[in-house]
Amino acid sequence: MNKKTFYITTPIYYPSAKLHIGNTYTTVAADALARFKRLTGHDVLFLTGTDEHGQKIQRVAEEKGLKPKEYLDNMVDSIKELWKSMNISYDKFIRTTDDYHIESVQKIFKKLYEQGDIYKGEYEGWYCTPCESFWTESQLDDHNCPDCGRPVEKTKEEAYFFKMSKYADRLIKYIEENPHFIQPESRKNEMLNNFLKPGLQDLCISRTSFDWGIPVSFDNKHVIYVWIDALSNYITALGYNSDNQELLEKFWPANVHLVGKDILRFHTIYWPIMLMALGIELPKQVFGHGWLLVDGGKMSKSKGNVVDPVVLVDHFGEDTVRYYLLREIPFGSDGLFNNELFIKKINSDLANDLGNLLSRTVAMVQKYFNGIMPAPIAKEPIDDELINLALDTREKVENNMEKLKIPEVLDEIWTLIGRANKYIDETTPWILAKDEDKKDRLGTVLYNLSETLRIISVLISAFIPKTSERINEQLNVDLTTWDSIASFDGTKAGTKVVKGDALFPRIDVEAKIEELNSLKEKKEKKEIKPIKEEITIDDFDKIDLRVVKVISCEPVKGAKKLLKLKVDLGGEERQVISGIAQYYKPEELVGKSVVLVANLKPAKLRGELSQGMILAAATDDDSKLFTVSIPGELPTGSQVR
């Protein structure tokens, strides 16, 4: 009999920087779903990979003095090492620089062009390099990207466009007729009401301003933009447009595209429209999970709250990280991470609840039965509640996993763990052991605990697989299939248990946090932005830096981030427009001596003339900025050299 298939994907990650705990969350969740489906008898394909083209990759590689592919090869190695350390069981890793993907993408582009869904035009507007997104003037937030808040660049270039509006009504109808296509429900409503129903603009799908990308096969001046290149990985990985489409026929449509909420629009609007144009069935579901908030906010280097999963694995082991992410983050909503919560959860759930249950059970089998598993020959009514809960939990777990309710699954399993610990207190094995006539009853109690642990081990195997293996080793059981936990008899009497190390040693919370903070401080001191390429003294001499005094300062109308300064250059008054309104109130700058790039060519910003630029130092993500100040005794007009 053929197995049911299950195809699950993560986004392909953009390797312009190291992956962080948020990327890890997506991949761990996908891995848990993939492992569970394998456990329940499905033929699974779990796809992940890297999105390797684009202007940002090209720039980052250049900054490091590397060719893009050389830079990418190093990054991909580190990503694969991360997934190995997190025990990620992906079946295929796709890179958009793979030859088969490039060839397939070129064929997709050509097909869409030849059938009239793509046309050539000219793009003029604003571009965000980090997000690889184009924006119209009306969409900008004070000339910053509405998605990430970073500055955008004005661009004008010839481009190919995809006729999105042609398929919009058809997609709206599909979403409304297939309520499970976009999940959670709130995300579906957002896509319909905020993007689709107001109307779609045609989508720019090629670039000419950089060359690190897949060339349009019939127009080499253009490279194919991220939308077709990256999104199509879900079918090119299965052999679409190749001589062997066996995987495509077997696994498509995907059961779940798992993505972060920030890229849900691309996966629920752009991607399905492309599939409609290609005549390909849509994926069954796109699930947009929430963000991982660190200490109440998004991660950023300047805040010092970026969480490196490698550090956590090194200090606590991969299963602690997997457990916290899967249990504590509401699947579909934002969730919190901080070291204190994380360590306390290890101590309470993993060390106290699960670890102690195993340790006490194995220790008592060793102490009272020389390590040989007794037979359950003296049952009592008090056993039924534990046995029934153990058997019922299997069905509850399966039902919740069908609905992608991962935290609820772990809640059910930990309810069983709690009940088993309570059963020890109720049956008091240490008292039974004092009465030789109660030997059979003692053996039954310990068998029930051991069999419950075997069932727990199977139940947790998709979520914390290494821990599951360690439990099986100590119980010395090999019956670990999903079907085997439909009955309460998988542990065999006469088996010799093997006492091992504690699953999760208790951690001194304060000492460990102090250690992690110390490591982070050392790491931050080492990390500095790469120095730009050398210039000569002649190059530097071209820049005329002068001391100026701020005479007046006021906001620029209609621009939240701009200030209009009048400065004294030593007898000459100038007007300067500076993007520092979010860091300084106008009155804080008046009377201050600052440094001006005096020979910068004048330019108009928001209709106001700017005659120079104020020097300032900022963090990498622009969350903090300070002007370069000069002691008041230096006269205005003095040269800075």
UniProtKB/Swiss-Prot annotation:
First-listed, main subcellular location of the protein, grouped into a coarse class: cytoplasm
Designated name of the protein: Methionine--tRNA ligase
One GO-annotated biological process of the protein: methionyl-tRNA aminoacylation
Motif stretch ('KMSKS' region): 298-302
Pfam families: Anticodon_3 (PF19303), tRNA-synt_1g (PF09334), tRNA_bind (PF01588)
InterPro entries: aa-tRNA-synth_I_CS, Anticodon_Met, Met-tRNA-synth_bsu_C, Met-tRNA_synth, Met-tRNA_synth_2, Methionyl/Leucyl_tRNA_Synth, MetRS_core, NA-bd_OB-fold
GO molecular function list: ATP binding; metal ion binding; methionine-tRNA ligase activity; tRNA binding
Residue interval(s) of motif 'HIGH' region: 13-23
Biological function: Is required not only for elongation of protein synthesis but also for the initiation of all mRNA translation through initiator tRNA(fMet) aminoacylation.
Localization per Swiss-Prot or TrEMBL: Cytoplasm
PROSITE patterns documented for this protein: AA_TRNA_LIGASE_I, TRBD
Binding site for ATP: 301
Cofactor binding note: Binds 1 zinc ion per subunit.
Reaction catalysed by this enzyme: tRNA(Met) + L-methionine + ATP = L-methionyl-tRNA(Met) + AMP + diphosphate
Entry keywords, A to Z: Aminoacyl-tRNA synthetase, ATP-binding, Cytoplasm, Ligase, Metal-binding, Nucleotide-binding, Protein biosynthesis, RNA-binding, tRNA-binding, Zinc
Enzyme Commission number(s): 6.1.1.10
GO cellular component, one term: cytoplasm
Taxon lineage: Bacteria, Bacillati, Bacillota, Clostridia, Eubacteriales
